[in-house]
């Protein structure tokens, strides 16, 4: 077993602490997006045999379209996609949408209609391909490129179609009575509500409109009163027996009743039960067994019953009494008078069976189907007079027309399950049986039988992913189109047109564009780091069109539900108004074809846990008992304990092991990806875990990524599935590597029709949506052998194929002079100087030269009134050089705009004529660096409109691009040649030649020496005598020629795209994009966090020598406040600190053994230590089978710290941490004596010290700090704008005014409210005074006062400001007068 597992140093090796084996493979993390959209487009399916779903279903549902007269019909045949015009990178660069043209084949059939018989015969059939706009395609990473930016379509959670029963929880009526209601929700169409009111009458509502008695709806379905009653109630027959009546006795009916008068056997006359006693269920059953058939009833017992059928005089046809009438003395007399001896009564006892439907029928004014239909028509279309036809058509179209009403397959399945029906799932409209079943079930609920539905159960909520959302949107577009097509078919001469002339595809294309551009669910991708991308694609939102709104969503919808287990993460959700409405899919969850979330379970057969995995939705899981993943099992897979903790029907309980039939697959199946990345999650408080999982998404990719010492084993999965790290598509040998690409010669999965070369282009310093930097680095060397799935390049925030969002830093938990008060963080200067938390951010600046009314704008270096110094970074075309260092206010692109001619004085005209002065008619509108930004120009792109002459800069960029493409082509060609000629040489070596190149003797044996005498291109001239081989040679040749042609064609196509002008928005002649990169070191004011919700702001950066240090002189990197732990209850960070300390200790030990090896060449101690760290089990690397080179590689990898994995809920326990600390030769307390860096004295107590994984978050002080002297003002109030984006000022608000008032600082207050704010004249004067060096000013009237006066005038109050102050007061009258 010497070298079965090759270790090439290209992956991070982790020591696993998990004890539970991984049985099921975790599904691909972005499967949700990709599978859904693939199912919608079905690009791979042959166009003839596509199943009826996705796009195919949309076309099938709208077509065929008939014109109004039925003389012609437009049918859908199939659809196809042409290859996309631009690839993903080109679309990103040119601000285009990555999409493929959709071609639909339509068939127009024209009929001849016989005027006499009305019979149709086909006159003409025309088929044609019609272009139906572009359909956006999904990239390999599950995103869409729309107008050059990457977007994600978030999946939506909504209420599943079907029927739901609920009550108002007693809130509607003051008595607190429960009012039950049923609601039938279709996928599309009208909602049907059936509800009780406080008087127990059953009402129906259609589309939340005015309510109607439910019996009206039943009558409209064609039932009459008697039929309705017989459907809902059983009947009891009272038989006349002398003066008394007999009632048949049934135990069911009488059990539980309190007997008012004696129960008398009608046959024997004996009293079987005295009055006042209660008839228990047991006693009732015993009476029946004794042979009690009927009991005596008096006339009083009949009163209050209801007739089950009409009482009719058959001779005259007169109806004496109607079904449902209540029996009183008068009715009874009528019955006796008519000579009835048997009366059929409805079986209503007001206890088990209520008279709700009978009472509703009594309230209902409608007597017939026509009246009922008219009533429904009046509610749905108020103000229109109903006719029988229109009412019938309208009622039919509400629930029974598949065009207007669709329950969807899900809705039908759910309805069948809830109501015990057995309709096919192709029946997608309502039936009479369905409506009756709903009303019956509702009445049962009111009678106290059955359960209401829980709408927050995941069995009643489903996920609409990209494909389905897109399908609905496209259907809307096609339906808009359908109207236009119908009108056009009727209005033009149908014989002469082709399908193309009938179709205007704009509405369909517009619907798609609108969805991707402005839907609430189409979001700008969060691309801060690979984790945030993956989380964004796995997000589930309850908001959006057809979903909830933040204001209306109550507590229950947001709460965690038992069915979330293994489906939706209970931890990861935003803080704030969206809490619980936006969720994340759990790690192992997947969405089934009906849109329900499924979670995997292991089957338990005969008490033994098998490795059989089944995926179940919440509905299917309800009937099982599910054990947890960490239940103790014996060797055979049986449960060790007699009683096992398990989940059953939403409750957690102890169940005997025989009853358990399923078991969780993995402990991490209940949390999301982000939460599964937090080690010791089980020791953190849920609120802090929520913050931790949310903050990991905000971590900025650092210049040097470093994987955590303490991980969870999820890191490589996230890095691979997010597409940040590049995995090999197939095995092979590395042929070439440089920073921008990797070329691999394939040796596995060789397909003769495809190239034998895989070229992987790496992204270099690209800007992400959040301005972070995307940069990939190769991990392989030339000559390496690669297997499929190996990581060959690291991306942003990945390290050897592991997700690496932050850095491992040495932390001490202790207060330090108040600098870590209130979660502040004290950092060592070493962290800044070593660029530990340095990140690169790339800003994009764009400038466009437009064609204005006064003439075109121009991008140029010749700008009026600008010094040569300011132009030093611009080339002759006026565009900044790559590599230039730019600062706030520097010109990036020089641009001038023509300005309107102002009338010139004669002197100006003369000067203009003499000096030819041109500068006066243009103004400088150059693109300058905004305040507070600086950096280095890393890339410039120039786009020109078709037909506009290119400047020198654009030509240079173009040449560079073409050179790069040519290099790619040449490399691919070289590898192709090597491959093909190698195979050719193998095939003909040692064969007898039948012919050959010029001067070659026939019949000679071909050898490799002989071949070298001829140039390779002449080898094809060798012909061999073996005909079969000759055929193979010819096949190889034609394949080689095809590959060469394909390569050349691809190259020419790309060159043509580069040289061709760009598509620009209207009015734009030329566009320049400048990318500026800035290196941001960490500084006070930046936000940092650990993975446990322990966040803080950097308060001070201390010189290294002042930081606390250990006995061996190692200084702490970071000092955190220990008071941040106890109240927050995120103890995980302390366990991580200890374990990180042990990892670093082990690393140090291995480093020492490496030094020993270098001196003595004895590798054994090193091998033994590594084998001890990685014991042989199925989770750890098989270090025992490593050869010496691999051992040295591994030792070099782990000498800074051994990486370990502690999976969530199955991680390292205290004993493991102690053992590892002991192995590393450290104290098991995890504490050390620290010395004060300023005095050199030891601190009084030992301090917890260790390694924590810290992240730098995307809340950087550079983006927030902002100052303004003068800037823009609001138009109306003339006050400065607010906010950094508007270059606004500080608002001196109401409360601040109170503060100055309280101080009595009148003059300060006056200038705050006037010249420093919105006194326009005053502030100009102050400016002039300051320029003069004068310090006096006079306050005028603030503009906001004028606004107030205007507002009052708009209300009709004429307010005038009287500012005519009397110059002098009138003199006081003399005393004498």
From Swiss-Prot:
GO terms for molecular function: DNA binding; DNA-directed RNA polymerase activity; ribonucleoside binding. The keyword Nucleotidyltransferase applies. InterPro entries: DNA-dir_RNA_pol_bsu_ext_1_sf, DNA-dir_RNA_pol_bsu_external_1, DNA-dir_RNA_pol_su2, DNA-dir_RNAP_su2_dom, DNA-dir_RNAP_su2_hyb_sf, RNA_pol_bsu_bac, RNA_pol_bsu_CS, RNA_pol_bsu_protrusion. Keywords: DNA-directed RNA polymerase, Nucleotidyltransferase, Transcription, Transferase. Its EC number is 2.7.7.6. GO terms for cellular component: DNA-directed RNA polymerase complex. GO terms for biological process: DNA-templated transcription. SUPFAM superfamilies: beta and beta-prime subunits of DNA dependent RNA-polymerase. It is an enzyme of class 2 (transferase). It catalyses: RNA(n) + a ribonucleoside 5'-triphosphate = RNA(n+1) + diphosphate. PROSITE patterns: RNA_POL_BETA (PS01166). Belongs to the RNA polymerase beta chain family. The RNAP catalytic core consists of 2 alpha, 1 beta, 1 beta' and 1 omega subunit. When a sigma factor is associated with the core the holoenzyme is formed, which can initiate transcription. DNA-dependent RNA polymerase catalyzes the transcription of DNA into RNA using the four ribonucleoside triphosphates as substrates. PANTHER family: DNA-DIRECTED RNA POLYMERASE I SUBUNIT 2 (PTHR20856). This is DNA-directed RNA polymerase subunit beta. It comes from Brucella abortus (strain 2308). The gene is rpoB.
């Amino acid at each position: 077993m010497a070298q079965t597992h090759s270790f090439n140093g290209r992956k991070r090796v982790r020591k696993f602490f998990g004890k539970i084996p991984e049985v099921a493979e975790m599904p691909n993390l972005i499967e949700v997006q990709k599978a859904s959209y693939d199912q919608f487009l079905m690009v791979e399916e042959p166009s003839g045999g596509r199943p009826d779903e996705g796009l195919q279903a949309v076309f099938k549902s709208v077509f065929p379209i008939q014109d109004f007269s039925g003389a012609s019909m437009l049918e859908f045949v199939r659809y196809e996609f042409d290859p996309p015009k631009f690839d993903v990178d080109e679309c990103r660069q040119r601000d285009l949408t990555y999409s493929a043209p959709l071609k639909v084949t339509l068939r127009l059939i024209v009929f001849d209609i016989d005027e006499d018989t009305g019979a149709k015969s086909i006159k003409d059939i025309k088929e044609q391909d019609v272009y139906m706009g572009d359909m956006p395609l999904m990239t390999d990473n599950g995103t869409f490129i729309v107008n050059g930016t990457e977007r994600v379509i978030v999946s939506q959670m909504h209420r599943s179609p079907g029927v739901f029963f609920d009550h108002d929880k007693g809130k509607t009526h003051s008595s607190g009575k429960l009012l039950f209601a049923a609601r039938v929700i279709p996928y599309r169409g009208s909602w049907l509500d059936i509800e009780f009111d406080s008087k127990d009458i059953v009402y129906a509502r259609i589309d939340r409109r005015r309510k109607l008695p439910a019996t009206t709806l039943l009558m409209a379905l064609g039932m009459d009163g008697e039929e309705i009653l017989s459907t809902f109630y059983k009947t009891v027959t009272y038989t006349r027996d002398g003066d008394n009546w007999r009632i048949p006795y049934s135990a069911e009916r009488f059990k539980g009743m309190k007997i008012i008068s004696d129960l008398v056997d009608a046959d024997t006359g004996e009293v079987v039960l005295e009055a006042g006693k209660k008839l228990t269920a047991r006693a009732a059953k015993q009476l029946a067994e004794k042979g009690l058939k009927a009991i005596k009833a008096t006339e009083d017992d009949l009163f209050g019953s209801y007739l089950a059928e009409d009482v009719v005089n058959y001779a005259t046809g007169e109806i004496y009494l109607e079904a449902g009438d209540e029996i009183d003395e008068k009715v009874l007399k009528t019955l006796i008078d008519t000579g009835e001896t048997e009366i059929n009564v409805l079986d209503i006892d007001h206890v088990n069976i209520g008279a709700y439907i009978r009472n509703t029928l009594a309230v209902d004014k409608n007597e017939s189907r026509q009246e009922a239909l008219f009533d429904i028509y009046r509610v749905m279309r108020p103000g229109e007079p109903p006719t029988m036809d229109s009412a019938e058509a309208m009622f039919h179209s509400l629930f029974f027309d598949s065009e207007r009403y669709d329950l969807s397959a899900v809705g039908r399945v759910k309805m069948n399950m809830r109501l015990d029906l057995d309709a096919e799932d192709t029946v997608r409209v309502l039936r009479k049986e369905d409506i009756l079943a709903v009303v019956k079930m509702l009445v049962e609920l009111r009678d106290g039988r059955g359960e209401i539905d829980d709408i927050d159960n995941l069995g009643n909520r489903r996920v609409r992913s990209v494909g389905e959302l897109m399908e609905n949107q496209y259907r809307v577009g096609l339906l808009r189109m359908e109207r236009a097509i119908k009108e056009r078919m009727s209005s033009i001469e149908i014989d002469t047109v082709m399908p193309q002339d009938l179709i205007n595809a704009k509405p369909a294309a517009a619907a798609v564009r609108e969805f991707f551009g402005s839907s609430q669910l189409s979001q700008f991708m969060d691309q801060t780091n690979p984790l945030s991308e993956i989380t964004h694609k796995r997000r589930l939102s309850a908001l959006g069109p057809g979903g909830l709104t933040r204001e209306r969503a109550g507590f229950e919808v947001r709460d965690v539900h038992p069915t979330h287990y293994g489906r939706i993460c209970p931890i990861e959700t935003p803080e704030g108004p969206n809490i619980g409405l936006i969720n994340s899919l759990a790690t192992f969850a997947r969405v089934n074809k009906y849109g329900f979330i499924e979670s995997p379970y292991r089957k338990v057969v005969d008490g033994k846990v098998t490795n059989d995995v089944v995926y179940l939705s919440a509905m299917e899981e309800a009937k099982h008992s599910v054990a947890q993943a960490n239940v103790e099992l014996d060797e055979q897979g049986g449960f060790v304990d007699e009683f096992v903790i398990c989940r059953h029907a939403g409750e957690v309980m102890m169940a005997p092991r025989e009853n358990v039939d399923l078991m969780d697959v993995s402990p991490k199946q209940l949390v999301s990806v982000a939460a599964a990345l937090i080690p010791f999650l089980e020791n953190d408080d849920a609120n802090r875990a929520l913050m931790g999982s949310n903050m990991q998404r905000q971590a900025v990719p650092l210049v040097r990524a470093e994987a955590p010492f303490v991980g969870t084993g999820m890191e490589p999965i996230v890095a691979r599935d997010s597409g940040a790290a590049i995995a090999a598509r197939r095995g092979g040998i590395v042929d070439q590597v440089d920073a921008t690409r990797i070329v691999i010669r394939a040796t596995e999965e060789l397909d003769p029709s495809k190239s034998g070369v895989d070229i992987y282009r790496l992204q270099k310093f690209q800007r992400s949506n959040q301005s972070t930097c995307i940069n990939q680095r190769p991990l392989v060397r030339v000559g390496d052998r690669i297997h499929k799935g190996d990581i060959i390049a690291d991306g942003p925030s990945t390290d050897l194929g592991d997700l690496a969002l932050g850095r491992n830093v040495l932390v001490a938990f202790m207060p330090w002079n108040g600098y870590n008060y209130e979660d502040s963080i004290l950092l060592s200067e070493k962290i800044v100087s070593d660029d530990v938390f340095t990140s690169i951010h790339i800003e994009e600046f764009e400038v466009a030269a437009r064609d204005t009314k006064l003439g075109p704008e121009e991008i140029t270096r010749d700008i009026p009134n600008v010094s040569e110094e300011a132009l030093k970074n611009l080339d002759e075309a006026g565009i900044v050089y790559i590599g230039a260092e730019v600062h706030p206010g520097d010109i990036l692109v020089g641009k001038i705009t023509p300005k309107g001619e102002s009338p010139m004085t004669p002197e100006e005209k003369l000067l203009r004529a003499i000096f030819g002065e041109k500068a006066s008619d243009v103004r400088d509108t150059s693109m300058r660096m905004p305040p507070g930004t600086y950096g280095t120009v890393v890339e410039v792109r120039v786009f020109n409109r078709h037909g506009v002459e290119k400047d020198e800069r654009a030509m240079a960029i173009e040449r560079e691009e073409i050179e790069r493409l040519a290099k790619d082509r040449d490399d691919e060609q070289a590898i192709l040649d090597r491959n093909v000629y190698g195979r050719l040489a193998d095939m003909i070596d040692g064969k007898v030649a039948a012919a050959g190149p010029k001067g070659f003797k026939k019949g000679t044996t071909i050898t490799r020496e002989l071949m070298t005498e001829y140039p390779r291109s002449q080898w094809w001239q060798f012909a061999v005598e073996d005909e079969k081989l000759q055929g193979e040679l010819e096949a190889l040749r034609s394949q080689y020629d095809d590959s060469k042609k394909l390569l050349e064609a691809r190259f020419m196509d790309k060159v043509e795209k580069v040289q061709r002008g760009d598509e620009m928005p209207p009015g734009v002649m030329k566009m320049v994009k400048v990318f500026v990169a800035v290196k941001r070191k960490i500084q006070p004011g930046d936000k940092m966090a650990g993975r446990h919700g322990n966040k803080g702001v950097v308060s001070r950066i201390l010189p290294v020598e002042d930081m606390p240090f250990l006995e061996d002189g190692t200084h702490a990197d970071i000092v955190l406040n220990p008071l941040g732990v106890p109240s927050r209850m995120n103890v995980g960070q302390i366990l991580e600190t200890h374990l990180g300390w042990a990892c670093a200790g082990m690393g140090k030990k291995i480093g020492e053994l490496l030094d020993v090896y270098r001196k003595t060449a004895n590798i054994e101690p090193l091998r033994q230590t590594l084998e001890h760290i990685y014991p042989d089990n199925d989770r750890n690397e098989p270090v025992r089978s490593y050869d010496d080179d691999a051992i040295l590689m591994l030792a070099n990898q782990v000498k800074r710290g051994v990486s370990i994995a502690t999976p969530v809920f199955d991680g390292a326990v205290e004993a493991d941490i102690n053992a590892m600390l002991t192995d590393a030769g450290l104290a098991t307390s995890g504490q050390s004596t620290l010395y004060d860096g300023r005095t050199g004295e030891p601190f009084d107590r030992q301090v917890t010290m260790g390694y924590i994984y810290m992240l730098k978050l995307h809340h950087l002080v550079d983006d927030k700090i902002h100052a303004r002297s003068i800037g823009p003002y609001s138009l109306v109030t003339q006050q400065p704008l607010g906010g950094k984006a508007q270059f606004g000022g500080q608002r001196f608000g109401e409360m601040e005014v109170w503060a100055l008032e309280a101080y009595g600082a009148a003059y300060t207050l006056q200038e705050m409210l006037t010249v420093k704010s919105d006194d326009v004249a005053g502030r100009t004067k102050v400016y002039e005074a300051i320029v003069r060096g004068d310090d006096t000013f006079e306050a005028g009237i603030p503009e906001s006062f004028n606004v107030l006066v205007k507002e009052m005038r708009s209300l009709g109050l004429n307010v005038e400001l009287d500012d005519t102050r009397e110059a002098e007061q009138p003199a006081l009258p003399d005393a004498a007068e």
